Amino acid sequence: MVYDSDVDVLRAFMGSGITVIVHTTNALLPMLASDISVATAWINTNIAPFAATISHISVGNEVLGTNNQSQYSMFLNSAIHNVYNALVSVNLHESILVSTTHAAAVLDPSSFPPSLGHFSSDIVPNIMPILNFLSSTGAPFMVNVYPFIAYIASSQNIELPYALGSGNVQISDFNSGLIYTSLFDAQVDTFISAIEKLGFGNISLIVTETGWPSYGHPSATLANAQAYNAYILEHVASSRGTPKRPSTPIQTQIFALFNENQK
């Protein structure tokens, strides 16, 4: 995951065999939405020269459902279409897929268990055209999944080994009968349920961020971060998928490569 289109970073990945997801900044959304020539210029400068190493573009990050980014929500759908059409103009729309990244805030707070996952009612008008776009282009729904955040918000109800994916805890979804052994799987399947409830069961899902902090909270320790990251690496490598979508690999990025201790 490359936040913003830093050409020096993208150049460094050229020839490495590693493909990356490039984000546009949220602040750029109004310009991308208002004029396709802006999107075309951005693609020609920041994407086309490095196309061999870019797999996806995320137009914005956590724009919907987060109060501090709500000023950009009205521009999101148009920006996505203009970026896609700019890729079409240089014949890169089949090799580079366009989507946008969502936080758990787009889900209704009552989305438990996973089979009852659904989007907040105020989000649906904004997310429906995005789902239509993803369905028609074959692009994935992108989500940031953080069991740590859910755990510290409800530690009295969530066991730490379940949040870390490192124990023998089993939680049954009373509605579907599926058994969950990790909060990560439960959160991913909650998003999938929400997508399916709107009629888009054909859309795949990518986890664009997940991780566990190592400082700043009693449960944010090096040992816990190591345990969680080891679990994620094993889970992704196994391609076992989730209870709702077994044997379906989950493309996942660990956040972050470096310590953001000043964030």
Question: What is each of the regions a protein language model found here?
Answer:
Residues 1-5:
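Catalytic beta/alpha-barrel core
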Residues 7-14, 43-49, 88-89, 128-136, ...:
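Short amphipathic alpha-helices and their capping/turn segments at secondary-structure boundaries
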Residues 10-108, 112-122, 207:
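Substrate-binding cleft of extracellular glycoside hydrolase catalytic domains
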Residues 81-85, 94, 99, 121-263:
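Substrate-binding and catalytic surfaces of secreted/luminal carbohydrate-active proteins
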